[in-house]
């Protein structure tokens, strides 16, 4: 059976931050290639706070604001065809709030949103962040990925 190229499906349903679809696709492809992950499809949705809070309530019975929601679909080891790694739902506005709360430079906005995409990809691969040890491990993987993406000029940008 002929291998079809990876589809990175990106949807932008928010108006808080301009999102370049091709930039998101490049980031996802770079990460998955670096991590040697084989899949057919990955979905990334950028939503406003209201839509993400509603989804958070529907999925987790928690209507509070969040920065990302990840719904893994097929485990990396699955032989499903087509193999769908998962769906990432991201609030760019959460990145704005995060940087403002810490008095960080808003020039880091796209790097922070890039971190959210990487974070979701790691969740799709089975990483978790429920305990301090898991959070530390995940943050380390995120930082490695951001360094790699910076070197490859694959961080999100405006």
From Swiss-Prot:
Q: Where does Zn(2+) bind?
A: 119, 123, 129
GO molecular function terms noted in the UniProt entry: metalloendopeptidase activity; RNA endonuclease activity; zinc ion binding
Q: Which InterPro entries match?
A: MetalPrtase_cat_dom_sf_prd, YbeY
Domain of life, per lineage: Bacteria
Question: Mostly located where?
Answer: cytoplasm
Q: Which GO terms describe its biological process?
A: rRNA processing
Keywords, A to Z, come to: Cytoplasm, Endonuclease, Hydrolase, Metal-binding, Nuclease, Ribosome biogenesis, rRNA processing, Zinc
User: Which function does this protein serve?
Assistant: Single strand-specific metallo-endoribonuclease involved in late-stage 70S ribosome quality control and in maturation of the 3' terminus of the 16S rRNA.
Q: What is the protein named?
A: Endoribonuclease YbeY
Q: Identify the taxonomic lineage of the organism of origin.
A: Bacteria, Pseudomonadati, Chlamydiota, Chlamydiia, Chlamydiales
Q: Tell me the name of the encoding gene.
A: ybeY
């Amino acid at each position: 059976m002929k291998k079809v190229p990876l589809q990175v499906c990106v949807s932008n349903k928010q108006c808080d931050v301009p999102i370049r679809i091709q930039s998101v696709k490049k980031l996802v492809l770079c990460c998955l290639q670096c991590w040697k992950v084989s899949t057919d499809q990955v979905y990334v949705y950028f939503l406003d706070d209201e839509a993400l809070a509603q989804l958070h309530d529907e999925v987790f019975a928690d209507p509070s604001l969040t920065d990302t929601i990840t719904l893994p679909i097929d485990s990396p080891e699955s032989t499903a065809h087509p193999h769908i790694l998962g769906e990432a739902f991201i609030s760019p506005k959460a990145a704005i709030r995060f940087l403002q709360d810490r008095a960080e430079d808003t020039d880091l906005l796209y790097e922070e949103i890039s971190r959210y995409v990487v974070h979701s990809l790691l969740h799709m691969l089975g990483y978790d962040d429920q305990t301090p040890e898991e959070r530390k491990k995940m943050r380390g993987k995120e930082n490695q990925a951001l360094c790699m993406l910076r070197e490859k000029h694959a961080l999100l940008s405006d």
